[in-house]
Amino acid sequence: MLRLGSHVSMSGKKMLLGASEEAASYGSNTFMIYTGAPQNTRRKPIEELNIEAGLEHMKAHDMDDIVVHAPYIINIGNSVKPETFELGVNFLQSEIERTRALGAKQIVLHPGAHVGEGADKGIKQIIQGLNEALIHDQDVQIALETMAGKGSECGRTFEELAQIIDGVTHNELLSVTFDTCHTHDAGYDIVNDFDGVLNEFDKIIGIDRLKVLHINDSKNERGAHKDRHANIGFGHIGFDALHYVVHHPQLANVPKILETPYVGEDKASKKAPYKWEIAMLKNGEFDPDLLNKIQNS
């Protein structure tokens, strides 16, 4: 079954219920949330996340397999500032608890940045952080994200992700989030040879670890190492390639999450594109006038 949705907001009093309602309004059957603002570590207690009402709404709308995204502020690749590393480990442990309470099985994590110390040192630090954060009997997996290679990011190649996975003691608790924009920006040819890229992923990491897909177009050419998302069909990856990924038979049961930009010039009146992009990916026909339609809706 095609599992297709987007990033949605979990905020206010409704929390999980509000997230599920937003996802349903887009025609989604899965979604991704941050448990609070992605740029900080302030979080509500689990009992204020309105989980019961949210799960009821999800069940009524045939939504499951939701995904949590850890905040950007976590950097367990930092070997320069011990306090940043410790904050990352401790916060990751508390995020695992929140993810479990929400009924999600995957928590997406940007592996970390080496902050100028070199990839090998960064990867070693990430391994240490994951070994400290993971508890062998937890039922939540950390889904390490494929990165674009911007700045000092680790995880820009399948080999780097495999190195992290191999170094972690309880690596059965690790999975991978495959981001189409990041992978394209890192230099992989998902436009002309997605099957070849997937085979390479399978050989180096193992396709059974691919548990989340982020479906994004890219504002940059392949290999740019930039990480700037574009709306579906309006970037350098293009609609046909992304439609192929979304409907790939080997990835049928993997939740596919859109993180494309809101549409509009004015920040106050920007509109979420997800209802339209999801419909377009389902029906298989690219609409070159889509952005105008969203703006005028």
From Swiss-Prot:
Cofactor(s) it depends on: Zn(2+)
Pfam families documented for this protein: AP_endonuc_2
Positions bound to Zn(2+) 1: H69, H110, E145
Keyword Zinc: yes
Reaction catalyzed: Endonucleolytic cleavage to 5'-phosphooligonucleotide end-products
SUPFAM superfamilies membership: Xylose isomerase-like (SSF51658)
InterPro entries: AP_endonuc_2, AP_endonuc_F2_Zn_BS, Xyl_isomerase-like_sf, Xyl_isomerase-like_TIM-brl
Cofactor details (free text): Binds 3 Zn(2+) ions.
GO biological process: base-excision repair
GO molecular function, one term: DNA-(apurinic or apyrimidinic site) endonuclease activity
SMART domains assigned: AP2Ec
Binding positions (Zn(2+) 3): H182, D227, H229
Protein residues bound to Zn(2+) 2: E145, D179, H214, E259
Record keywords: DNA damage, DNA repair, Endonuclease, Hydrolase, Metal-binding, Nuclease, Zinc
Entry EC number(s): 3.1.21.2
Function comment: Endonuclease IV plays a role in DNA repair. It cleaves phosphodiester bonds at apurinic or apyrimidinic (AP) sites, generating a 3'-hydroxyl group and a 5'-terminal sugar phosphate.
Family: Belongs to the AP endonuclease 2 family.
Alphabetized HAMAP family for the sequence: Nfo
Protein name: Probable endonuclease 4
Name of the gene: nfo
